[in-house]
Amino acid sequence: MILDLRLVGVAGTVWTAAWLLSGAPEWSTLSQLTLWPAAATLTGLVLPLRRARVRATLTQVALCCAGAALVAASIAVAAPARLPVEVTEAAASHALVTATLTVLSSPVETASFGGAPAGSSRVRFRGSITKLSQGGRSVAVAVPVVVFAEAPAGPALRIGTVIRLPARVRQAEPGDAAAALVFGRDPPETVADPPWWLAWADDLRARFAAASARLPGDGGDLLPGLAIGDTTAVGPALDGAMKTSSLSHLTAVSGANCAVVTAGVLLLGGYLRLRRLARLALALLTLLGFVVLVTPEPSVLRAALMATVLLLSTGSGRPGRGVPLLSLVVIVLLVFDPWLSRNYGFVLSVLATAGLLVLAGPLGRMLGRWMPARLAAVIAIPLAAQLACQPVLVLLSPTLPLYGVPANLLAGPAAPVATVVGLVACLLLPWLPGVAWGILQLAWLPSAWIAAVAGTSAALPGSRLPWFGGAVGVAATGLLTFLTLALVLAPAPAPAPARSGAAARLGRLGRLGWLGWRIPAVAVLALAFGSYAGSLIGSGLGRALAFPADWQIAACDIGQGDAVVVRDGDRYALVDVGPDPAALAACLDTLGIDRIDLLVLTHYDRDHVGGIDAVIGRVGTALVGSPENAQDRRLHERLADGGAEVRTGARGDRGTLGGLRWELLWPVRGSPVMQTGNPGSVTIGFDGRGIRSVFLGDLDEAAQDALRRASAPGRVDVVKVAHHGSRDQSQGLYADLRATVGLISVGADNGYGHPTDRLLQILAQVKTVAVRTDRQGLAVVALEPGGHGALTLWTERVASRKSD
């Protein structure tokens, strides 16, 4: 198969322009003034040319300039509309506004956000503000936003619902898909229900989820995700196993899911002997219905579009057309919405589709040498997608899934069965519930198999191997993947007939030429494998040698949340427990901690208390904030039942941890304000053994300024940055602290834009070294032996550094 790659360069140029200009829209006008004339000039030069090669090259460059100019024009038009002056003024003044908006994604439970009542049930979803009201004045707008709000007391919000929400708004980071963040102050009020077709799909999804819940074990929890992309029943343990084994893509509605559905319809059409055009039309209509059923979120719409590319490529009878068609789709989407260029989901959708178009066929033929052709094709599809996406996946998690490919080979063939059979059961539930229940039990079998593969793979030793992060990790993974595929898929030379003399010598030279580039490729792979294996073998010894034996502070890498340990000898304090018990338990095991002398829970958001199960029964004293509801009080009871002394803390409380002194700096006891939620975060400072530290919880800017006025901490060596590095920070407080190290406990690709550029600039201005758990992993601070106050900073993924 010959691939047509002529539009790939244009798509790459358009993507680069979109990525750059979406983060700096103020340059879009100047870019147009440069690119449009360049495109016109090149077009004028091309027309009279007769040399085909030069003509083709200049045409490519002209198309690249025109594509980039279209992106610049799109941003110049869209940027002011995305962020009108009414929104920027409301954000700057922190004014309370009333937003009328349409829900565009399924709400998910969120861990925390500034300004909302603590302890309440909160959700996050994408939406579009259609009207903004303030002070009796209303203005029509069209602003893409991410909304953080209390969950309504009645039915859950659904896609397509129009709501009214009293809220405050903040500008998002430049380049984000959302132009602003909306923080609701009260539960949303429903203004209009979704259209009938969205309501029908929501009812069908609810029926399917309820029926699947009756099935046993992880198979029942996983089935809605495999069939219709509903992962609400997937618990943390199963979710972690799916991610560790590189199977989480099976529960996200992707181009592969859409392709499975359309492929089933095409097969049915072939069985009914329909014409090709009729089969394609039927498949496209089915795809449209599937999109409605699984919720028409932006990511699902993109997946459906990628599946359409595969469908049209296959249906045309010329698979080689798929690459230019994919390139054209990328160009159109990025011109229509340049902010997609920074979306990881879009990147992975494009790469997975490209992998299926380019790699699935050759891999299937290669595997077909040792197994039946149909089985080879089934295995080649997930393998091609995994190989194409892996270089980008290391940006999200700088690890290599050792068993990812075998797990996909084992689970991959079961996924389309679970999808198709589960989807049939879902569609039959309203009309033939008995028949649907029987089919649902059949769908449970492949679902349970996938869950078992995920659990087994995740439990094996070395299931996630450390790898390079950032651009180095992408480049290294891409190079090694390319060399491996080139060696495996390159055709071997045909055996030459027996010859003598000069002909024989020429034949040997030809075979040597075939080996020419393969010898260095094998050498590079062997060197890389040997070096990496050696680093893994030596990592335990290297870690033991580099890890500061007398460390005092350790920030655990537990995702989007806080869990920081303070130590003196064999005495340990833990400030917050993060969102996930398994992640916290792994960190405590790494640090060799089995007992917590002092536990501080700054407030009750899930990203600070969700991991509590990891320490129940291991805590001596717990300092907590004021409880707001029965759920908070039950948490106190669980700690007490586990043997902990639970005390509500406030400013002025003091104590010791071995040779360290600690003091609570916030909140003020008895104050009518800032007692709960982020503004009421219990703030603790430690002093002793040469290091002063302060832990700011999720304090917002107003609370930080109030802390300065009430009990200024003074200069410290280490500060745990507030609220994972959000924008809502007091520059004055960090200037007062003048910390040497700023610990930012934050999750990779967290969706909030944490840590923000504003926070990083604040730290840079006071020469505080920013240490991020999302990029550097576990971070440990110690006092340099004999260093006269110098600190040693050790991080899991960055070499040790010393700070004066």
Model region roles, listed by residue range:
Residues I2, P152-P166, A192-W196, G235-D239, ...:
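Non-globular, low-confidence helical/coil segments that flank catalytic cores
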Residues G235-G404, G469-L545, S626, G643, ...:
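Hydrophobic alpha-helical transmembrane segments in multi-pass membrane proteins
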Residues G355-G462, T740-S745:
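Alpha-helical transmembrane segments of multi-pass integral membrane proteins
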Residues I2-L3, V54-H249, A586, R595, ...:
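Membrane-interface helix/helix-cap signal primarily in integral membrane proteins
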Residues G23-W27, A72-A92, S299, L340-S341, ...:
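C-terminal region of N-terminal signal peptides and the immediate post-cleavage residues
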Residues I2-W19, R170-Q171, G175-R302, L311, ...:
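Aromatic-rich juxtamembrane segments at the membrane interface
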